[in-house]
Each structure stands twice: as C-alpha cells, then as structure tokens.
C-alpha cells in the first residue's frame, strides 16, 4: 500500500504539467483586433477576432449600418474581400482600415443567391468561439456610435458642406411658424412662386447641377432617405437626370404641362374596365389623407377655391357615391378683381430743372414703374405677414444675423465688392435703370460692413426700433407712389434703404423674386442723407449713416467668425455658392481633377493607385464613387 501510495503520489504532480496544455488551450482564444470600417460619409470601429471570416465580419457590420450582408462590399488594398476568406489571409491586423461600399438592393440579388451556396461549407468549419466573441465586441462600442445619427436629426436644414443650420437658431418654434406661413402664402399665390423661379439668382443656382447636388446631399433628411433607399443616390449622382430635373424646375410652364398630362392620363383610366374602382381607391387612400394633412398644416385645401367658392366640408361626397362632375382645373386663373393701375405717362417738370426734359421724363417713367411694381409686391399679404413676423419676433432676426453662416456670407461679400455689386445689378429692378445702378454701387461696402456691426444687430433686435423703421417704410412708400417727383432718386427702392437692415436678413430665408439684395439709399431731397441705421441724435454722424466711432474695419469680421472656424470648407462652399449666384450665365465647369479631388483621395485610400484610371472612371460616372468603384473593379483582370 505504501508503494502504491508512493507510486500514486508522483503521478498527481505529474498531472499538473500534463494538464497544463489542456488548461492552456481554452485561454488561447483568438486575438481581438480593432478594425476601422470607413464609408464615404462616416467611419466606425469594430473589435473582432483576428481569425474571423469576412462573412462574420459583414454580419457585425450589417447590424451597425442597418443593411443586408449581401449589400456590403469590403475593399482592402484595392481588392474585394470574399466571404469565405479570413481576415488573417488578407493581412488585416489591429489598427488597419477597411473600406465599405453599400450596394443598392435591386442590383446584388443575383449575386446574393449564389454566394451562400459556395460559402456555406467553408464558413461552418470555422471555430465556433468567434461567433460569440464578435457580437460581444461590437455591442461594447455600439453606444459610442449611436450618438452620431441623433445629431443629424436635430435640424432639417442643411446647406453645402455645413453639417446643418442648427447654429442659426432655426429650430425655434417661431421659425417653424414663419416657415409654415411662408409655404401657405406660396401655395395661395402661384405668381409669387413663378417670380421666385424666374429670379436670376435662382436660375443661376438651378443651372449648376453640382451645386444643387451638394445642397441636396448635405440635407440630413436626404442623407437618411438615401441610406434607406440607396437607389436614389444613383439618381442624384447622374448629371443628366439632375440637369433634366433642374430644367423642369426652372420652367414652371413645363412642370404644369407634365402635371396636366399626368391628370389626363389618370382621367382616361375611367374608360378602362376596372379603372374607375382604381381611381376611387386612389382618391380614398391617397388623395384624402394628403388633403387632410395639408388642411391641418396650412389651414385649408389650396385647390378648393379654384373650382368652387364653397367650403372644404360641404363639397365632399361620400366615398361610395359616384362622382359625375368633372374635376376642376387647378391651373385656371382665379377670378380676381384687379384694380386698374393709375399709370400717368405725363410728367411735370420742376421749374428749377430746365435742361434735359426728355431724359427726366424717361427717368420719371422708370421711377413710376419701379415704384408701382415694388409697392405692389410689398402690399401683398405674404410680405405684410412676413414683416409682421419680423417685428413680433426680433429674437429670430438676432439669431439669424449672429449665426456663423450669415456672418461668413457677409464677410465673403464684403471682401469682394465686385461680386456683391454683380449680385445686386443682376436683379431686373436695377438692370433697367443704369442711374440707380451707379448710385447703389459705391454704397455696397458700407452696407455690408454695417450689417456686421454688433450695434446694428442689437438695434434690429429692438421691437420699438423695428416698428419705427416700419413706419418710415410705409411713409416712404406713400411718398414714392403719390409724389414720385419729390424724391426721384429714391422712389425705385420704395424706402427699402431705411428698412434695409430690418429686411435683409430675410433674404436667405425667402427670396422674393426680382427685389434682389436690399441696399441703403442716399439723398431724400431737402431732408438730407439717410443711412441704414445711423442714429439721428449722434453728433458727427456721416452721410452714410455710420458713426465715425463705430466704423467697422476690415479686420473686424474675421475676429467675430473665428470661434466657429468658418475659413475651412464652409467658407469655400459659400464662395462657390456666391459665385454660382452671381454669374449671369452658367459658370464654367472646373478642372476634373479639382472637381473630383475628394473622390480621388477616397479611391487612393481604398487602394486604387492609378490616378488616371480613377479620374476617367469618375468622369464617366459623373462623380459617383460607388459606380466608379464598380467600373474600376470591372476593368481589372480577374
């Protein structure tokens, strides 16, 4: 027994070393590596085992990006990663970056059916510990990435390379009410919408597909829509489709004709068997909910007053009753009683001006036409409601003027007076009056500097000051209409110089057709010069309305814009937008290398090192990086 005890004793410690390899095998789990997955818009970090397959890596990525695994294409070193391969086979180590391309749903359906059959046998032979480690690793970093999508939903306004216009203070309820009221006025007055679309500024912007695509793609709501429906990105990245869409948008008559053809096609459905039932279901399921939503938001059906004068509730028939009456024509002009405009062609020349009677008569004629035109615009309910909103909500104006975007635009215009003058002179209100152009041109730099003055912004946020400016504006309108000969050099603006600082901030929100930018004015007869906001009681005030003590130097705007660092891509976008708006003709397209600089850098980072081939692919696809990648991969030898 002793021998047995002695003999049995040594094996016990000998089992310790023998059990060491068995005990070391469970701790020898695969190494967890951190791999960065980068898309053209965002970047995420994943922690996965190093021996994971590409298919398992895609499953972890699909949960984060909310896409199907067959839509994901992983690219590393210029090669597409196959599902059955492992990360170690491609040399993917800790800290490296893998590029991700998300395909649309309708394209990869043919490939998605063949890949699982080939990868099923290989993926099942991999270790089972990786499947449990990968989700645990991804969930640890999920809360960090979940904070990024929520910031894009904070504001529905996006512009250019700006993330959003949330810094403008546009999330306040006051701006939402103002926006809804503006939309209601545009629906109730199609003429105002036509004037906006025919404005040279808007025409120049719509003639640049790249600028419009940049504006659309920068909108957070459009980004979410494209992520949910990737096929829309191909429409936006197709320059031909964008050009056709913008051509239709610039031509309201063409848009109305297309809508009319659509209505005619729908009305012809009644002659087809079963077509009436389809129309009834469409009106019941689609039209009525849309009209109810429009009535809740805008307060009424905009097409209700076109067909009949009855209320919206009286003319509605039950859904099961057959409607024999023809549909009203929504494009028929409303029966409005227009008052005859008193246009006096004969002008009375003053006794003091004996020279140039013919030139004074033509100038007075232009003055009367411009005065009546601008007065008619400012007498519309939309403009009156807009001005009332401005006076009731001075905080809205202060938020807009103190926003980095507004200050950056003012700085860009003040640094380039010629560009600002070109923007102003391209308005139809000034193109027909060269004398007025010469008066406005030298005053633009002072006006732009005054708009950056903090005292001007503070004065505009004062409700009493705004009411006083409104009274001056209304009085000058009356003078310009009733006695245009008293202030001939002032009448075309109808007092907008004095109220310039109060109404100019509304320009970026609602451009009202041919009014154009608002500038200060010079002499008003014997009253003397009136500046935009110069205090009347301040001694030593100059003729331009800028007190000598508060003259803003050229370096002042740069100090106010420094906190938000607007000199980066935002400043470049603003300059590009201003250049696009100022051009009388569509701007010339830039060099393709400059135009697709960002896409070339992304392709180079993905491993596509042939710059010439990348550039040709981007030119052929119109800058669509996904289509360019597919084109480059299709041209590579298999």
From Swiss-Prot:
This is Ubiquilin-2. Residues 327-336 have a biased composition (Pro residues). Homodimer. Forms heterodimer with UBQLN1. Binds UBE3A and BTRC. Interacts with the 19S proteasome subunit. Interacts with C9orf72. Binds CD47. Interacts with HNRNPA1 and HNRNPU. Found in a complex with UBQLN1 and MAP1LC3A/B/C. Interacts with EPS15, EPN1 and EPN2. Interacts with HERPUD1. Interacts with RAD23A. Interacts with TARDBP. Interacts (via C-terminus) with FAF2 (via N-terminus). Interacts with UBQLN4. Highly expressed in smooth muscle. Expression in other tissues is very low. The lineage of its organism: Eukaryota, Metazoa, Chordata, Craniata, Vertebrata. Plays an important role in the regulation of different protein degradation mechanisms and pathways including ubiquitin-proteasome system (UPS), autophagy and the endoplasmic reticulum-associated protein degradation (ERAD) pathway. Mediates the proteasomal targeting of misfolded or accumulated proteins for degradation by binding (via UBA domain) to their polyubiquitin chains and by interacting (via ubiquitin-like domain) with the subunits of the proteasome. It comes from the Eukaryota. InterPro entries: ARM-type_fold (IPR016024), STI1_HS-bd (IPR006636), UBA (IPR015940), UBA-like_sf (IPR009060), Ubiquilin (IPR015496), Ubiquitin-like_dom (IPR000626), Ubiquitin-like_domsf (IPR029071). Keywords: Acetylation, Autophagy, Cytoplasm, Cytoplasmic vesicle, Membrane, Nucleus, Phosphoprotein, Repeat. One of its GO terms (cellular component) is cytoplasm. Residues 189-217, 219-258, 393-440, 444-476 form the STI1 domain. Residues 1-26, 112-158, 305-316, 337-364, 533-551 have a biased composition (Low complexity). Residues 505-537 are annotated as: 11 X 3 AA tandem repeats P-X-X. Residues 33-107 form the Ubiquitin-like domain. The modification N-acetylalanine is found at residue 2. It is found in: Cytoplasm; Nucleus; Membrane; Cytoplasmic vesicle, Autophagosome. The gene is Ubqln2. Residues 552-570 have a biased composition (Polar residues). Residues 589-635 form the UBA domain. PROSITE patterns: UBA (PS50030), UBIQUITIN_2 (PS50053). The modification Phosphoserine is found at residue 25.
């Amino acid at each position: 027994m002793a021998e047995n005890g002695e003999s049995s004793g040594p094996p016990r410690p000998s089992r310790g070393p023998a059990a060491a390899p068995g005990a070391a095998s469970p701790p020898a789990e695969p190494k967890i590596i951190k791999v960065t997955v980068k898309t053209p818009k965002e970047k995420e970090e994943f922690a996965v085992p190093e021996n994971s397959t590409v298919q398992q890596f895609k499953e972890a990525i699909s949960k984060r990006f909310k896409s199907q695994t067959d839509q994901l294409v992983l690219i590393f070193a210029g090669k597409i990663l196959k599902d059955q391969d492992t990360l170690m086979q491609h040399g993917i180590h800790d800290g490296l970056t893998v590029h991700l391309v998300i395909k649309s749903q309708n394209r990869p359906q043919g490939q998605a059916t063949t890949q699982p059959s080939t990868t099923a046998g290989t993926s099942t032979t991999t270790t089972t510990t990786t499947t449990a480690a990968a989700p645990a690793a991804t969930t640890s970093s999920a809360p960090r990435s979940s904070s990024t999508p929520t910031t894009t939903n904070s504001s529905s306004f996006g512009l250019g390379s700006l993330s959003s216009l949330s810094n403008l203070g546009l999330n306040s309820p006051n701006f939402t009410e103002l926006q809804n009221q503006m939309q209601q006025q545009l629906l109730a007055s199609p003429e105002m919408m036509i004037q906006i679309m025919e404005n040279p500024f808007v025409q120049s912007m719509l003639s640049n597909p790249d600028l419009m695509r940049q504006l659309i793609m920068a909108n957070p709501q459009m980004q979410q829509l494209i992520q949910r429906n990737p096929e829309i990105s191909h429409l936006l990245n197709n320059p031909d489709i964008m050009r056709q869409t913008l051509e239709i948008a610039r031509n309201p008559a063409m848009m109305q004709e297309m809508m009319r053809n659509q209505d005619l096609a729908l009305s012809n459905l009644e002659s087809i068997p079963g077509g009436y039932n389809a129309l009834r279901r469409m009106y019941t399921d689609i039209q009525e909910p849309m009209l109810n939503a429009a009535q809740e938001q805008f307060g009424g059906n905009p097409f209700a007053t076109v067909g009949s004068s009855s209320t919206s509730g009286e003319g509605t028939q039950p859904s099961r009753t057959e409607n024999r009456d023809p549909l009203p024509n929504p494009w028929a002009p409303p029966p409005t009683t227009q008052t005859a405009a008193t246009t006096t062609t004969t002008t009375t020349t003053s006794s003091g001006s004996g020279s140039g009677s013919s030139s004074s008569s033509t100038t007075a004629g232009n003055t009367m036409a411009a005065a009546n035109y601008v007065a008619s615009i400012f007498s519309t309910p939309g403009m009156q409601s807009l001005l009332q909103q401005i006076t009731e909500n001075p905080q809205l104006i202060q938020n807009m003027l103190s926003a980095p975007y507004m200050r950056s635009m003012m700085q860009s215009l003040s640094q380039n007076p010629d560009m600002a003058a070109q923007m102003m002179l391209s308005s139809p209100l000034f193109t027909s009056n060269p004398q007025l152009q010469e008066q406005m041109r030298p005053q633009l730099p002072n006006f732009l500097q005054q708009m950056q003055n903090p005292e001007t912004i503070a004065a505009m946020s004062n409700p009493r000051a705004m009411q006083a400016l409104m009274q001056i504006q209304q009085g000058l309108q009356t003078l310009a209409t009733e006695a245009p000969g008293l202030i001939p050099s002032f009448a075309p603006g109808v007092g907008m110089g004095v109220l310039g600082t109060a109404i100019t901030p509304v320009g970026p929100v609602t451009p009202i057709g041919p009014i154009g930018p608002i500038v200060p004015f010079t002499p008003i007869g014997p009253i003397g010069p009136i500046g935009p906001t110069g205090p009347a009681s301040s001694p030593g005030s100059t003729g331009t309305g800028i007190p000598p003590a508060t003259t803003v130097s050229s370096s002042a705007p740069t100090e106010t814009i420094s906190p938000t660092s607007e000199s980066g891509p935002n400043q470049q976008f603003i300059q590009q937008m201003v250049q696009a708006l100022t051009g009388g003709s569509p701007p010339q397209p830039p060099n393709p290398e400059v135009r697709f600089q960002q896409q070339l850098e992304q392709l180079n980072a993905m491993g596509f090192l042939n710059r010439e081939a990348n550039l040709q692919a981007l030119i052929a696809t119109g800058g669509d990086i996904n289509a360019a990648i597919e084109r480059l991969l299709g041209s590579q030898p298999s």
